[in-house]
Amino acid sequence: MTELFIDGAWVDGAGPVFASRNPGTNERVWEGASASADDVERAVASARRAFAAWSALDLDARCTIVKRFAALLVERKEALATMIGRETGKPLWEARTEVASMAAKVDISITAYHERTGEKRAPMADGVAVLRHRPHGVVAVFGPYNFPGHLPNGHIVPALIAGNTVVFKPSELAPGVARATVEIWRDAGLPAGVLNLVQGEKDTGVALANHRQIDGLFFTGSSDTGTLLHKQFGGRPEIVLALEMGGNNPLVVAEVEDIDAAVHHAIQSAFLSAGQRCTCARRILVPRGAFGDRFVARLADVASKITASVFDADPQPFMGAVISARAASRLVAAQARLVGLGASPIIEMKQRDPALGFVNAAILDVTNVRELPDEEHFGPLAQIVRYTDLDDAIARANDTAFGLSAGLLADDEQAWHTFRRAIRAGIVNWNRPTNGASSAAPFGGAGRSGNHRPSAYYAADYCAYPMASVESAQLQMPASLSPGLHF
């Protein structure tokens, strides 16, 4: 039950016991006691004590530890990928990709620190202007369940490089992945107190977010939770709040020559990771007319052949289970609400077993729904919207408070230029899936999708603050005095 990591040691939690389960088998994967408010207090105090020495450590020394962490990720790739698969249900092929991305993020983050922050000098009269960057102090990192290794890593790695200390609160649905990741950090030689792990559910998260001794909070998760955090920190400008949230993402399909290529990219956009990527396409906009009819028919044909299976099945499936049986039942309920509003099922979603997270890829035509809810349904539930022309498609695509990702599948380059100029989103792709993002590019969106860009270069920006100095090695009188001064 020693599942918390505080001040360099594994310790027991004093809060309620909870467990995680494999959503594809209902097998118990992890069990432990959650962190109480007192446990959170000890974790924050530990991080505060460790901050002075860690931030004073030479940057190269900090980077050496972070690089060792990356090397250990490569060595333990299979073990960590297996834990990710067991706890989240995602297929092993995808879990392995997640671990590889975690390791690759280290070099990207080190480069980002030097290029976007770091130290810069410029000569000036009687001295030099110096721009340095300083860490904030103790930061809380809240991680999601869909990428329980990679996404928290996108906050933790740049935070540590910059000299911050961290209290990490993972999703209660993926505590085993968090423990395995923190063990790798420990074995990489991270000093005691620099990274602390507090496991738990809502009460643990509230205790950490409310703690008056944190200097920043970095969050990846749902827009509803992120919005609550934003309200909570209203009137506290001293807190650095970085939010990366979800989206109601549109994929616009134009009339193209290669219809199977378009269907493939639509399948990837909507159903990769069982639809549990924040960049997945929730709305697929298809032209009215014969081409659109053929596209929808082909999309339904291919999607109907996708069979979800357990994470370690051989051969590997395209889709695993969604994160829990509860999440699966919520998706089926969301489908029922949309049908009640006038949506027409093309492929109806069904939950295979009420105790498991298996659902099939589903497609609804929502064109005739007059007041379509602006919601993110986090799973393989795609909505078809028919449009008349590109202007109509762009207007419908932008009809959302979110703005994370968007995509256009089109042979016409001019259509792409029109689309990219008019669309409102942080990730905008042409002839690529909406969930295709470069690890070396900013990741995030506009509107209710967030306020910062984690996981790549821009993460360095919110992990440190700029300190501007004008400096002269010699104290001396200026060559000329200001008017009215007499010496």
From Swiss-Prot:
<dbReference type="InterPro" id="IPR029510">
    <property type="entry name" value="Ald_DH_CS_GLU"/>
</dbReference>
<dbReference type="Pfam" id="PF00171">
    <property type="entry name" value="Aldedh"/>
</dbReference>
<dbReference type="GO" id="GO:0019545">
    <property type="term" value="P:arginine catabolic process to succinate"/>
</dbReference>
<dbReference type="InterPro" id="IPR016162">
    <property type="entry name" value="Ald_DH_N"/>
</dbReference>
<keyword id="KW-0056">Arginine metabolism</keyword>
<comment type="similarity">
    <text>Belongs to the aldehyde dehydrogenase family. AstD subfamily.</text>
</comment>
<keyword id="KW-0560">Oxidoreductase</keyword>
<dbReference type="InterPro" id="IPR015590">
    <property type="entry name" value="Aldehyde_DH_dom"/>
</dbReference>
<dbReference type="InterPro" id="IPR016161">
    <property type="entry name" value="Ald_DH/histidinol_DH"/>
</dbReference>
<keyword id="KW-0520">NAD</keyword>
<dbReference type="InterPro" id="IPR016163">
    <property type="entry name" value="Ald_DH_C"/>
</dbReference>
<dbReference type="InterPro" id="IPR016160">
    <property type="entry name" value="Ald_DH_CS_CYS"/>
</dbReference>
<dbReference type="GO" id="GO:0043824">
    <property type="term" value="F:succinylglutamate-semialdehyde dehydrogenase activity"/>
</dbReference>
<dbReference type="GO" id="GO:0019544">
    <property type="term" value="P:arginine catabolic process to glutamate"/>
</dbReference>
<dbReference type="InterPro" id="IPR017649">
    <property type="entry name" value="SuccinylGlu_semiald_DH_AstD"/>
</dbReference>
<comment type="pathway">
    <text>Amino-acid degradation; L-arginine degradation via AST pathway; L-glutamate and succinate from L-arginine: step 4/5.</text>
</comment>
<protein>
    <recommendedName>
        <fullName>N-succinylglutamate 5-semialdehyde dehydrogenase</fullName>
        <ecNumber>1.2.1.71</ecNumber>
    </recommendedName>
</protein>
<feature type="binding site">
    <location>
        <begin position="221"/>
        <end position="226"/>
    </location>
    <ligand>
        <name>NAD(+)</name>
    </ligand>
</feature>
<feature type="active site">
    <location>
        <position position="244"/>
    </location>
</feature>
<comment type="function">
    <text>Catalyzes the NAD-dependent reduction of succinylglutamate semialdehyde into succinylglutamate.</text>
</comment>
<feature type="active site">
    <location>
        <position position="278"/>
    </location>
</feature>
